[in-house]
Amino acid sequence: MRIGLIGSGQMGNRVEEVAQERGDTILLLQTASKEATTLVFPELPELLIDFSHPDNLEKILSYSLSYQLPLVIGTTGYTQSQFQEIKEHAKHVPVMYSANFSFGIMVMNQLIKQAAAMLQGWQIELIEKHHSRKKDAPSGTANMLLQTIQEVQKLQPVYNWQGKKREENQIGVHSIRAGSLPGEHDVLFAATDEIFTIKHESFSNRIFAAGAVEAADWLKDQSPGYYKLEDLLMDKGV
C-alpha cells in the first residue's frame, strides 16, 4: 500500500514503523503548518491514515474526497458536528473511525455490552489510566466504552467522585495520569458481595499502529461507508 500518513507524533511514528516492516510505502505529509490549505504528499497515496488533530479535519476530508481515497481516522477529540461531517464524507468514500485500534479493546467493548445487558441493577465504574503526558481526559477509549454502556443502560456519568454519595442511574468515570503508563481500562460491575471486572492493558502503542495499518489494508477494498473496527473483526469471523 501507499499510505498517506497525517500526524508526526508518537502514533504517526509507530504507524510508519509498522507499515514499513510490512513492506508498505509511507508518504509523509509535506505541509504540516496550520496555515496550509491543503495536503501535499510526495506522490498520490492509495489511502490516508490520520493521527493528528481535529483542526486538520476539513483539509483531510477535502483531499480524501478530491482523490477518492479511503480514510482511516485515529484522531480523538472531535466535536459532534465534526463527527457528522465525517459520516457525511463516508457517503462518498470508505471511512473507518476508531478511538482505539486495539483488537483486544474491541473485544472488551463487545463483552461490556453483553455484561451491561445481563447485569441490570449492578453499579458500574469505569477507570482509565494513562501516562502523564496524555492531553485528554477521559480518554477517547473511555468515552467509547461509556457510550457502549449507555446504549444499554441509561446512566449519567459522574467524573471522579467527590463530596457526595452515589445515586441510582449513575456511572463513575475516573482518569489517572501518571508516569509512563501506556494504557489501562477497567470496567467494574458491582453488586452486594460480588464484583465482576473486565480489564484491558496495553504495554506499547505499537498495537494501535498495527491495528490501524491492518484496518487500512481492509478498508481499501470496501465500498463507501462509515466503518468501525468491529466491522473488520466480524468480516474476519472474530
Region spans (language model):
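Short acidic/histidine-rich motifs immediately flanking catalytic phosphotransfer sites
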Residues: 41-49, 66-71
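Aromatic/hydrophobic pocket-lining residues that form π-stacking "cages" and hydrophobic walls in ligand
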Residues: 15, 60, 86, 111, ...
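Short, acidic/turn-prone active-site loops that include or flank metal/cofactor-
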Residues: 32-36, 76-79, 100-101
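Residues at the C-terminal ends
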Residues: 21, 65-66
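Rossmann-fold NAD(P)-binding glycine/threonine-rich loop
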Residues: 55, 62, 75-95, 106, ...
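Rossmann-fold dehydrogenase core element
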Residues: 70, 85-102, 116-124
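C-terminal substrate-binding/catalytic lobe of Rossmann-fold NAD(P)-dependent oxidoreductases
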Residues: 2, 6, 10-42, 120-238
